[in-house]
Amino acid sequence: METAGAGTGQPASGLEAPGSADDRLFLVKGGIFLGTVAAAGMLAGFITTLSLAKKKSPEWFNKGSMATAALPESGSSLALRALGWGSLYAWCGVGVISFAVWKALGVHSMKDFRSKMQSIFPTIPKNSESAVEWEETLKSK
């Protein structure tokens, strides 16, 4: 019994095909890039919020870094717990939205997704002119 793609060099389904090495490399690079951007964004947001809180009221910031009888949990451990839950909710939310868009478009691979997005959104015109010369643009007159 032959599969639907036998003889044509095409697999019967997208699940059977391992994909080319270039496609896998593209996926890995894309995943690493998105993970790095997400981690950098989370870290920058957390550090910015922490520095603003310390700048606004340093005495309360220092008071919140140690657990007391009135507050059994220190402010920093509470903040780290909130960061953990917030990160979990953010990752799950983005995953659910991505999955919903993927299923709504009815695509089965990244190539299908790319072609579907290119058909939905307008094309970006390629400008044959050279890039803007910033030195001349920003030069004071």
Swiss-Prot record:
Scaffold protein that participates in the c-ring assembly of mitochondrial ATP synthase (F(1)F(0) ATP synthase or complex V) by facilitating the membrane insertion and oligomer formation of the subunit c/ATP5MC3. Participates in the incorporation of the c-ring into vestigial complexes. Additionally influences the incorporation of subunits MT-ATP6, MT-ATP8, ATP5MJ, and ATP5MK in the ATP synthase. Residues 51-81 are mitochondrial intermembrane. Interacts with the core subunits NDUFAF1, ECSIT and ACAD9 of the MCIA complex. Interacts with ATP5MC3, NDUFC2, TMEM70, MT-ND2 AND MT-ND3. It comes from the Eukaryota. Keywords: Acetylation, Membrane, Mitochondrion, Mitochondrion inner membrane, Transmembrane, Transmembrane helix. The chain crosses the membrane at residues 30-50, 82-102. This is Transmembrane protein 242. Its main location: mitochondrion. GO terms for biological process: mitochondrial proton-transporting ATP synthase complex assembly. It is a multi-pass membrane protein. GO terms for cellular component: mitochondrial inner membrane. It is found in: Mitochondrion inner membrane. The gene is TMEM242. The keyword Glycoprotein does not apply. The modification N-acetylmethionine is found at residue 1. Signal peptide: none annotated. Disulfide bonds: none annotated. Belongs to the TMEM242 family. Residues 1-29, 103-141 are mitochondrial matrix. The keyword Cytoplasm does not apply.
